Amino acid sequence: MANMARHGSPKLAELTALTEFTLAKPMQSMVHELLSQLGPELPDRPQIIGFGVYIWNVIQTTELVRALKAQRPGVVVVLGGPEVSHEIDSQEIVHLSDHVISGWGDVSFPKLCLALLQGPKPLMKIIQGEQPPLSDIELPYREFSDADLANRVLYVEASRGCPFKCEFCLSSLDKTAWAFDLNPFLQELDILFNRGARNFKFVDRTFNLKIEASAQILQFFLDRLATDSAQGLLVHFEVIPDHLPDRLKELISQFPPGVLQFEVGIQSFNEEVQQRISRRQDNAKTEANLRWLLTESNAHLHTDLIFGLPGETLQSFAEGFDRLLNIGPQEIQLGILKLLRGTPLARHTQAHGMVYDSQPPYVIRQNNDIDKESFERFTRLAKYWDLVANSGRFKQTLPLILQAHAPHHSPFWAFMSFADDLWQQTQKTYGLTPEALVDAVFTYLTVSRLFEETQVRQFLLKDYLASGARGRPMCLAHENLPLGGERLGSSQQNLRERQDRHADLQK
């Protein structure tokens, strides 16, 4: 939206509207809303709809484009986004559309719309997106409404691109990272803050790449924290784990609890796997920096591991998980490898027997080192780990679940045993109520692991009360519990409560 005037025309900007849908919205409702916004068809006046297409919405967007074309064949459909920027000709949604912008669309989309409306009309269906200097891109932040500021996490970017070449990531196709001019960017952040914005998520792939810029951004938020108006501030950065010089440490250490969240991609501690996928990571520095952040700062650490990388065995992943768990980040996100269109990861398919789903999100199902059944077990484990560990709802009970036992004597395998048991009990990974989950944990620990019932019940009672749930699990039926149903807040409130539960655990 912000660039429709700058790279199109003021009139084009006036004619443009931004519309958002959820994946759950009925198809015909979306079609009706879009066609109503366009109004009736008029001779010699093209009607244009642009779609951002991603791995998570391409199926629904394909259906929507098909329905739009069926009801109004003359509408001009323009596609953009990462999912249609690679392997373009093989996709059904591309065949249904009129134009596709591959790559950056900030400049190319306004220019295309202007050409469609005023001529000369473009001859090519596939348009390579123009990558301008970042100074030529209008920052979009003044487009945010007051409702956006009050109810949403605000996505902001101080830079684009990534200099690293991790083969599973689309950013590996970038030649380098490009930084927006810092002064105008900070001015826009200041305007957002003064309008009431308090929840900022930086989408930079490598926030701590350029230390001078990183330091100025951190200082910007420290300065706001020194005022009385910064209540509720939450800032999320994605950082590379082995690059944390003293200047950044000095600034990070000044933040109070509940403000900083760092997403830290570890992906794998296996050095052979790292080399195979062109990932540069100093494991010793990574571990040292994580331990420093946990002991010397108040940052909340959301760390990532990827299961299924070429050459990673189940045992080597388990060892990496145990190593990361021992370091002690508040959250460990267990991701499953996906073959994103255009990534160099595809070069390993034959040599490592990589088998992926043919439909989005292209999740791996088996390879030469890990069979299909093990992938299915791990998929369940990852979902249960998020429910039990990452949620912070079982901080008293989790150590019992993770107690290593024969035959593997490993926290990873201990949780795998729990996940297998939970699956046998419930046959589901979604839709588990807090009460059903508490009862399943109780059954596992007392029946399968033979822990003393009184001890387990005591831990579960503390966890259940601290979680804010208000039901009555069967195993706690004789305890004094408040009633009224679980409290559900906004996503921002839930994120804050999740961090608070982890913060309490560290006290």
Q: Where would I find each of the regions flagged by the language model?
A:
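A general structural detector for well-ordered alpha-helical segments in enzyme core domains, enriched
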Residues: M1, L34-Q37, Q60, L64, ...
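Acidic, low-complexity intrinsically disordered segments
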Residues: M1-L186, I191-R195
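Alpha-helical structural signal in soluble globular domains
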Residues: N3, H7, A67-Q71, L96, ...
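Conserved C-terminal portion of the radical SAM core fold
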Residues: P10-L12, I48-G50, L186, I191-V203, ...
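Radical SAM enzyme core and accessory elements
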Residues: L35, L42-R45, A382-K507
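Short aromatic-enriched loop/helix-cap "lid" or pocket-rim segments at secondary-structure transitions
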Residues: C113-L114, I137, S214-A215, L248-K249, ...
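Radical SAM [4Fe-4S] cluster-binding motif and immediate context
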Residues: L139-S297
